[in-house]
């Protein structure tokens, strides 16, 4: 099975299944000397882990990460960093009734056709459980980026039909939804409570922002920074769309509105989302992710079995009624991994490039 590694100079490889004994990751290319601790990684893992509120899956996984290699006396050595998280709360019997059935909107049908064999327990490799290792690896990237003045953070900007206006970063860590508007939290809670009573699920929109990124990151033509971000963010489970900057709203904009004019004091807008011609402009990099509703619900759905016979499928087990609630740390991790990789690639080729033109901020 290919496709388990992302990056060229800063690479992240993951392995493991939802109900296997453990999840693992190998992070390669991190420069030596970076101060890193278990607490650095655990902070983001605790933000993503299941069972932290009544609005997420009740699977209880501590997601305690172990560093197996690449760190000595609290600093990276420049060697491969091995990471491990043990699975502790699998209930595989919940899935025995559907081992020969294909759950609608899941990867069951496509994995079956591609490989001829699949781990049906909790979705196996296709489960969002895999993203725990991305978050652990992304924490390393975030720690290094911080030494370069780069900060990556995200928030939920929509849950189902409820749009969430951005008010303050201070609110994001104070509620289960990563909502930047504290006044919206009661409405979000009421909506999710009703959704559980309906035994249904809903989608969400996540916004992730990187500030402090210098101009110059991105490798035209095929490795444009926005293309790489779209690739990485689309690889997250349940993501069905990615926008950079104004995204699809730019369709209705006129050129006089969309163009981000430059002044000696800074850019006048950021419709480009901090990327021009596939290269970072120095403005905040802004991406939006659309996540589909969770496919695992107890409302019967029509499908077929492995022999092609019609069946009704009811998915048991413990699932998130909205996967977007826990997606913010995952989106942050993937953006950080992309920026880390491109920072090292830019440094390798263009470290000696100097221009007299000032770096503009955004007004």
From Swiss-Prot:
Task: Spell out the PROSITE patterns in the cross-references.
Answer: CHORISMATE_SYNTHASE_1 (PS00787), CHORISMATE_SYNTHASE_2 (PS00788), CHORISMATE_SYNTHASE_3 (PS00789)
Question: Which cofactors, by name?
Answer: FMNH2
Q: How is the cofactor bound?
A: Reduced FMN (FMNH(2)).
Q: Which GO terms describe its molecular function?
A: chorismate synthase activity; FMN binding
Q: EC number(s) in its UniProt entry?
A: 4.2.3.5
Keyword terms: Amino-acid biosynthesis, Aromatic amino acid biosynthesis, FAD, Flavoprotein, FMN, Lyase, NADP
Q: Report residues binding FMN.
A: 125-127, 237-238, 277, 292-296, 318
Pfam family of this protein, just one? Chorismate_synt
Which SUPFAM superfamilies is this protein grouped with? Chorismate synthase, AroC (SSF103263)
Q: Its Gene Ontology biological processes?
A: amino acid biosynthetic process; aromatic amino acid family biosynthetic process; chorismate biosynthetic process
Which principal EC class is assigned to this enzyme? lyase
Keyword Lipid metabolism listed? The answer is no
Which Gene3D superfamilies does this UniProt record tie to the protein? Chorismate synthase AroC (3.60.150.10)
A single GO CC term for this protein reads: cytosol
Instruction: Name the pathway it acts in.
Output: Metabolic intermediate biosynthesis; chorismate biosynthesis; chorismate from D-erythrose 4-phosphate and phosphoenolpyruvate: step 7/7
User: What residues does NADP(+) bind to?
Assistant: 48, 54
Q: Which reaction does it catalyse?
A: 5-O-(1-carboxyvinyl)-3-phosphoshikimate = chorismate + phosphate
Give TM regions.
Answer: none
Q: Does the keyword Transport apply?
A: no
Q: What does this protein do?
A: This reaction introduces a second double bond into the aromatic ring system.
Family as reported in the entry's similarity comment: Belongs to the chorismate synthase family.
Subunit-level organization: Homotetramer.
Q: Which PANTHER family match?
A: CHORISMATE SYNTHASE (PTHR21085:SF0)
* Protein name according to UniProt: Chorismate synthase
For this protein's source organism, the top of the classification is: Bacteria, Pseudomonadati, Pseudomonadota, Gammaproteobacteria, Pseudomonadales
């Amino acid at each position: 099975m290919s496709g388990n590694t992302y990056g060229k100079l800063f690479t992240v490889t993951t392995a493991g299944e939802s109900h296997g004994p453990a999840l693992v990751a190998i992070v390669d290319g991190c420069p030596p000397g970076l101060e890193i601790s278990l607490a650095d990684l655990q902070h983001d893992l605790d933000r993503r882990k299941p069972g932290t509120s009544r609005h997420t899956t009740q699977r209880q996984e501590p997601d305690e990460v172990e560093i197996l290699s690449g760190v000595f006396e609290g600093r990276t050595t420049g060697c491969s960093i091995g990471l491990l998280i043990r699975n502790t709360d699998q209930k595989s019997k919940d899935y025995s009734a559907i081992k020969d059935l294909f759950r609608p909107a899941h990867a069951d049908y496509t994995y079956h056709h591609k490989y001829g064999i699949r781990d049906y327990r909790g979705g196996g490799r296709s489960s969002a459980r895999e993203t725990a290792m991305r978050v652990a690896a992304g924490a390393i990237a975030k720690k290094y980026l911080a030494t370069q003045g780069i900060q990556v953070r995200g928030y939920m900007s929509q849950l189902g039909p409820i749009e969430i206006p951005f008010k303050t970063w201070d609110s994001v860590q104070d509620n289960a939804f990563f909502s930047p508007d504290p006044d919206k939290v009661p409405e979000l809670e009421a909506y999710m409570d009703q959704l559980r009573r309906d035994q249904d699920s809903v989608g969400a929109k996540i916004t992730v922002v990187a500030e402090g990124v210098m101009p110059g990151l991105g490798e035209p033509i095929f490795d444009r920074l926005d293309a790489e971000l779209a690739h990485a963010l689309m690889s997250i489970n349940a993501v069905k769309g990615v926008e950079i900057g104004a995204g699809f709203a730019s369709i209705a904009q006129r050129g006089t509105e969309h163009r981000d004019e430059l002044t000696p004091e800074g850019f006048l807008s950021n419709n480009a989302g901090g990327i021009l011609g596939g290269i970072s402009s120095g403005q905040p990099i802004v991406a939006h992710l659309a996540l589909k509703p969770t496919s695992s619900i107890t409302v019967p759905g029509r499908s077929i079995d492995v022999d092609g016979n019609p069946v009704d499928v009811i998915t048991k087990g413990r699932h998130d009624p909205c996967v977007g609630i826990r997606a913010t740390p995952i989106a942050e991790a993937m953006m950080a991994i992309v920026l880390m990789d491109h920072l090292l690639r830019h440094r390798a080729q263009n470290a000696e490039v100097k221009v007299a033109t000032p770096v503009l901020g955004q007004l």
